[in-house]
């Protein structure tokens, strides 16, 4: 069992948690992920590590409540326990041998972009960060990003905060200004990563995307996390989660990732309704 030692709501749908997991914290690196189960009957859900403290033995996760398991996890509080917390899994983000990079994060994907940006900065790499959100109300980790990079560009789709436009607008501007990036790392919704890769391709800039496909065991045995990269089948849990953004088959990835979306939403809705009904019964 793994204890929740800290919980913070970052916005209405996104939650930050620190889990007491000393063995995971000891080995964790930016870009890797864990798999959790809330209880014995729960599904196994992968989440990218959002931070870690080796001295305290804690691992941070940031998640959006989209299905039953994340809704159940979000209903727990500090001092509660979860059944499983396995990791670190996957290959860490490669921060070596680079002079300047640009990390691009979208929405809740910024939770994953943050530790990678921090790792680049700590490795002595000049780090630009572009983060994008739909509006001001869902902006997360702004102060943390300011400490983890050399230049931060915050974009909102509606212009309610930061600069108006998508992350690709700012990326295009930076590339056209003549900045020479050794790498662009994109983390977020699949369409965003796809268009970031399309933006960088004419400039010949190496682009890496962090993928989070459907996953079950996290060891490559189930095949659920398979993705097509450069015409070859790869497994995100062992070959990734970072891949060459110019070679990923995004259309296939989007199709596979959407298979259970409606069911996840329905399960979450049922769970919320059940809890509300139980609360009403207790009040009576």
Where are these regions (language model features)?
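Short Fe-S-cluster ligation motifs
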Residues: 235-239, 243-284
């Amino acid at each position: 069992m793994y204890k929740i030692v800290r919980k913070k709501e970052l916005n209405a749908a996104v939650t930050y948690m620190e889990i007491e997991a000393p063995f995971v914290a000891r080995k964790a690196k930016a870009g890797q992920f864990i798999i959790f189960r809330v209880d014995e009957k729960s599904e196994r859900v992968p989440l990218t590590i959002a931070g870690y403290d080796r001295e305290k033995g804690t691992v941070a996760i940031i998640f959006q409540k989209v299905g039953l398991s994340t809704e159940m996890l979000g209903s727990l509080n500090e001092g509660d326990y979860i059944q499983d917390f396995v990791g670190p899994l996957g290959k860490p983000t490669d921060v070596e041998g680079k002079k300047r990079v640009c990390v691009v994060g979208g929405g809740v994907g910024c939770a994953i972009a943050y530790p990678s940006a921090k790792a680049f900065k700590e490795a002595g790499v000049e780090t630009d960060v572009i983060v994008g959100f739909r509006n001001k109300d869902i902006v997360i980790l702004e102060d943390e990003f300011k400490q983890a990079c050399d230049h931060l560009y915050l974009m909102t789709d509606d212009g309610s905060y930061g600069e108006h436009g998508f992350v690709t607008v700012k990326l295009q501007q930076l590339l056209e200004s003549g900045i020479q990036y050794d790498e662009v790392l994109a983390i977020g919704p699949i369409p965003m990563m796809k268009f970031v890769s399309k933006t960088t391709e004419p400039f010949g800039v190496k682009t890496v995307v962090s993928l989070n496909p459907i996953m079950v065991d996290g060891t490559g045995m189930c095949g659920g996390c398979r993705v097509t990269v450069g015409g070859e089948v790869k497994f995100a849990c062992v070959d990734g989660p970072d891949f060459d953004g110019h070679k990923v088959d995004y259309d296939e990835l989007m199709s596979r990732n959407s298979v259970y979306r409606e069911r996840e939403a329905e399960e979450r809705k049922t769970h919320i309704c059940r809890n509300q009904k139980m609360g009403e019964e207790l009040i009576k």
